[in-house]
Every structure is written in C-alpha cells, then in structure tokens.
C-alpha cells in the first residue's frame, strides 16, 4: 500500500470512528440479547446410553418375534384341530342315529330266527328282504356288521359274555354270538356279545 493510500485510509477511519463505535455497541447488545433468549442446547446421549437403548430395543424385538411365532404355531394347531373335528363330525355324525337303529336290526334278526319258513314263507321272505334293505342302507353310511363266529376273540371288537370248553374249537375262539356288533368306519359302536372257547 502506498503512503498516500495509508493516509487516506487513516483519515477515513478517523472520520467514521464514531459510526463504527455505535455500530459495534448495537451488535454487542443484539448478541447479548440473543444469547439470553437462546434455548439451552440439547444434550446428546452418551455412546453407552445409546448402546443400552439399542440392546433393550433388540431384546424387545426378539420377544415380540417369539410371541408372534408362538401365536402362529397356536393358530396352526387350532386350524388343524378344527379340520380334524369337522372331518370327524362328517365321518361319525350319524353315530347316534345308527346306535338308535341297532335295536331295530336286532328285532328283525330275532323275528327272522323265530319265523318258520314252512308255515309262512311269504312272511319269512318279507323279513329277509327288509333285513337286507336295512343292512344295505347302513352300509351306505360305512356301517359294518361284526359277526365273529369261528374267529379268534378280539377284545377291541368283542365282548365276552362267558367262556366254555369246546372240544372241536381252538382255544380263545368265538363259539356263539349272542348279539352281533357294528362298526362305523373304524370305530366300534357296539361290540359283538359272544361266548369264547377255553382249552
């Protein structure tokens, strides 16, 4: 900077010294006011606090995930159980009706045994036909007659009324059937009442 420029600058500064002074005072006052009205600075959490919060959030997320998995499994179990119950209701829904009709079948069998073929052949034929129609109707609903004469005794399907020695029959075989049994699908709704042979 030349000497002339320095002098001009000094002169300019001196002339405007008062203005700068006033301006600086105003700026300082504004700065003081702003600093008084400023909100306190937000505190930033520490690294360890953030780490703890993250750990807690991860634990909560894991717990919620486990709960949702358990809820889904329970829902699937309920769905399967309901499907099984509906299938069983369709399969075994007629069980009470069949059980109520079995005494009618028993009565028809007894009437057939008592009816004499020779004295009234048409009545005997009518009873046989009625019995056949009845058993065919039961078969349509997956009902099967259990007539175990000569078979080995099965406690799942037979009810032993008594035991008797039978020389011509193998031991533990059915020698007499008092009342035939019935199965609905694979479920025994009435076991056959039988006499079983002994040694």
Swiss-Prot record:
Its source organism is Legionella pneumophila (strain Corby)
The record's comment on protein family reads:
Belongs to the GrpE family.
Q: What does this protein do?
A: Participates actively in the response to hyperosmotic and heat shock by preventing the aggregation of stress-denatured proteins, in association with DnaK and GrpE. It is the nucleotide exchange factor for DnaK and may function as a thermosensor. Unfolded proteins bind initially to DnaJ; upon interaction with the DnaJ-bound protein, DnaK hydrolyzes its bound ATP, resulting in the formation of a stable complex. GrpE releases ADP from DnaK; ATP binding to DnaK triggers the release of the substrate protein, thus completing the reaction cycle.
Gene transcribed to yield this protein: grpE
Q: Which GO terms describe its cellular component?
A: cytosol
Instruction: Tell me what this protein is called.
Output: Protein GrpE
Q: Name one Pfam family in it.
A: GrpE
Ranges for the region named Disordered are: 20-52
Which UniProt keyword terms apply here?
Chaperone, Cytoplasm, Stress response
Family annotation (InterPro entries): GrpE (IPR000740), GrpE_coiled_coil (IPR013805), GrpE_head (IPR009012)
Compartments annotated for it: namely:
Cytoplasm
UniProt xrefs under CDD domains: GrpE
Gene Ontology terms: biological process: protein folding
Subunit info here reads: Homodimer.
Per the UniProt record, the lineage of the source organism begins with:
Bacteria, Pseudomonadati, Pseudomonadota, Gammaproteobacteria, Legionellales
Q: What are the protein's GO molecular function terms?
A: adenyl-nucleotide exchange factor activity; protein homodimerization activity; protein-folding chaperone binding; unfolded protein binding
Protein's UniProt keywords contain Cytoplasm: yes
What HAMAP family does the record point to? Answer: GrpE
Leader sequence range is none
């Amino acid at each position: 900077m030349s000497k002339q420029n320095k002098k001009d600058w000094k002169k300019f500064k001196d002339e405007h010294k008062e203005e700068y002074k006033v301006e600086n005072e105003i700026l300082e006052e504004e700065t003081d006011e702003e600093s008084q009205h400023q909100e306190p600075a937000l505190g930033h959490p520490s690294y360890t606090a953030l780490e703890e919060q993250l750990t807690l959030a991860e634990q909560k997320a894991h717990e919620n995930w486990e709960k949702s998995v358990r809820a889904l499994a329970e829902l699937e179990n309920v769905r399967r159980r309901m499907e099984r119950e509906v299938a069983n209701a369709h399969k075994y829904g007629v069980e009470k009706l069949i059980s109520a009709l079995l005494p009618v079948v028993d009565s028809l069998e007894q009437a057939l045994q008592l009816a004499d073929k020779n004295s009234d052949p048409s009545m005997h034929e009518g009873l046989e036909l009625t019995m056949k129609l009845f058993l065919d109707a039961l078969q349509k609903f997956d009902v099967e007659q259990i007539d175990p004469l000569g078979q080995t005794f099965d406690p799942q399907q037979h009810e032993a009324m008594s035991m008797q020695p039978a020389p011509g029959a193998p031991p533990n075989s059915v020698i007499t059937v008092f009342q035939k049994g019935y199965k609905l699908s694979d479920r025994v709704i009435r076991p056959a009442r039988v006499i079983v042979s002994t040694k």
